[in-house]
From Swiss-Prot:
Localization terms from the record: Cytoplasm
GO cellular component annotations of the record: cytoplasm
Family annotation (SMART domains): Iso_dh
Gene: leuB
Signal peptide: none
Site positions (Important for catalysis): Y119, K165
Chain segments annotated as transmembrane: none
Annotated pathway: Amino-acid biosynthesis; L-leucine biosynthesis; L-leucine from 3-methyl-2-oxobutanoate: step 3/4
Source organism of the structure: Haloferax volcanii (strain ATCC 29605 / DSM 3757 / JCM 8879 / NBRC 14742 / NCIMB 2012 / VKM B-1768 / DS2)
Protein name (record): 3-isopropylmalate dehydrogenase
Source organism phylogeny: Archaea, Methanobacteriati, Methanobacteriota, Stenosarchaea group, Halobacteria
E.C. numbers: 1.1.1.85
Amino acid sequence: MTEEIVVIPGDGIGAEVIPAAVDVLKAVGDFEFVEADAGDHVKEETGEALPQETYDLAAEADATLFGAAGETAADVILPLRTAVDSFVNVRPAKAYPGVDALRPETDLVFLRENTEGVYSGHEDRLSEDLSTLTRVVTTSASERLAEYACDYVGGEGGSFQVAHKANVMRETDGRFRDAAVAVADERGVETEEVLMDAFATRVCLDPTQFDTIVCPNLAGDVLSDLAAGLVGGLGLLPSANIGPDAALFEPVHGSAPDIAGEGIANPAATILSAAMLLDYLDHEAEADRVRSAVEGVLADGPRTPDLGGDASTEDVTAAILDRL
């Protein structure tokens, strides 16, 4: 049976990088693509950034590939993650030969809790002077992330780091840390605890101290973006939002309105997200081919302006397709 992939270009450069990734997927497999819409322009036209039809398509598809959203990002990506019941956001941050990186030895994977924390939407404006935010952390969600992390590092004998701020947020981050460490201990997986602010310093000084980092929602968002600065920028970071029966894949970068429409957006992060999608659908050989092609182009060129080159999105995509 042909697998169904929903593609949502979204706003800004999403409309430029998603077609590039679709061309790559077509080059390595036989998929049925269903295009859906979401984002700022959809809200202007219909009054809602994420139509129910798009939400339903993502919930029912074998996998979904999303580009970017602008001002309506929170109204689009958070519900889409809910649609696939995504409990973990997987964010690799890797430096590639040929790319000018602050820390070329960087090779990290962030496993970020994806349903709770300060992104769970419980904000209130109580007066002209006071707004509040409720942070939600449950043992069950923390354990589910930890179980995934144990599987990710190969189970017994593996290891990962737990980044938290339990010395200050004792109840919430304390609960997260305790749950993650307890699951790892039960599975025979070694853990190292690191305070998230200390991690930010240490990873800049020597990223080889770390490999797989398990974090609460906000910390994972911030720390993985920091890691992007070590490897050459957000244009290189893919991500996967994994649920029990569905998944959503997206580049970490945003809609980049400053360059949207110029045809110079770096498609690497989106194409690498497509490689993660292939892994998820058990097409590991094809995923490896895609990653190899991207790495070859990053090493030898052509490169988009964000990486010091003058190539267009189409030029880079064509070079990747040639290698496939």
